[in-house]
Amino acid sequence: SKAFAMTGWRMGYVCAPKELIKIMLKVHQYTIMCAPTAGQYAALEALRSGADTNYAYVAEMVRAYDRRRRIMLDAYEKMGLHCFEPRGAFYTFPCIRSTGLTSQEFAERLLREEKVACVPGTAFGESGEGFVRCSYATATDKVAEAMARMQRFVERVRDART
């Protein structure tokens, strides 16, 4: 689903040795019976139409995501927020500890004060404290605007601490 920007559809497939597939199927069968029918048809169409165009539009999509990712990483650097470079999803996970806010405080205030949504790192476990997850699965101009707003917010928070 990621190659075709079908975010949230939870579609995918596995290529693995037969014995591993058998084990994976046991887990899968007790987790979910199958993906929703609409999702299966959408995934099938994505694969069919992608094959017809040699995945040219997928390559363009990858370039677009890379541009958005670069916008975010460059913005974090300007803000003084360390962030590892993501390599497999549409999310960044910057460290916000330097702001003095918890992940929850940062996410709530950023939403309330700048209308920018992010997910507190603690949503992914205790070790996520001090981080937030931000998505770049949206239009490039929206990513740039969100980063400008986040920078204003971070500057305001840091100024208030001094």
Show the residue positions of the predicted features.
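PLP-dependent class I/II
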Residues: 1-162
